[in-house]
Amino acid sequence: MSIMPDHWIRQMATGHGMIEPFVETQKRDGVISYGLSSYGYDARVADEFKIFTNVDSAVVDPKAFSPASFVDRKGPVCIIPPNSFALAHTVEYFRIPRNVLVICLGKSTYARCGIIVNVTPLEPEWEGQVTIEISNTTPLPARIYAGEGICQFLFLRGDSDCETSYADKAGKYMGQRGVSLPRM
């Protein structure tokens, strides 16, 4: 596998709709950076958030997940309580080629503040807005800025196409828009 450079990402985004909307240059002035970088793409977080709450003394069960475990927030800023967790999604919609696997890393600006981002790999032929898991590991409230960078995606191209893609498996998160909660 090879990591793909900026010119390949640009070509795939503008010519094949791999990333929409696509920001062709990295935006940095007064914001947490987003857009095309040398070997990746810094995605923006949208203005919709689901923040974990324990109002009903719920237990988190991935096989029987209750949406009541979250409080919905929409706006330009999200405050994640200390030692808590939120779900969000990217502004961008991704369409991953059959011979590409995409991995995600958090932004150093947030990581240096104790805010950790997790996203599972984007599999070949998956498409949708990416649901982002954001953990505030600090004992203080943490501010997340909608419309600004939240994570960086790295595109790894295989030497050949995979035998079975996410689309072939009819994956349960195919075509998702907005925040997707766990599904069985």
Swiss-Prot record:
Supply the Pfam families for this chain.
Answer: DCD
**One of this protein's GO BP terms?**
dUTP biosynthetic process
InterPro entries documented for this protein: dCTP_deaminase, dUTPase-like_sf, dUTPase_trimeric
Q: Name one GO molecular function term.
A: nucleotide binding
The record's EC number reads 3.5.4.13
Give the top-rank taxon of the lineage listed in the UniProt record for this protein. Answer: Bacteria
Task: Using the UniProt record, name the top-level EC class of this enzyme in a single word.
Answer: hydrolase
Which SUPFAM superfamilies does this entry report, sorted A to Z? dUTPase-like
Q: In which pathway does it act?
A: Pyrimidine metabolism; dUMP biosynthesis; dUMP from dCTP (dUTP route): step 1/2
Residue numbers annotated as active site: E133
DNA-binding listed as a keyword: no
Q: Spell out the subunit comment.
A: Homotrimer.
**Which PANTHER family does the record associate with it?**
DCTP DEAMINASE (PTHR42680:SF3)
Q: Matching NCBIfam families, A to Z?
A: dCTP_deam
What does this protein's UniProt record list under function? Catalyzes the deamination of dCTP to dUTP.
The protein's name = dCTP deaminase
Q: Which organism is it from?
A: Granulibacter bethesdensis (strain ATCC BAA-1260 / CGDNIH1)
Q: Gene encoding this chain? A: dcd
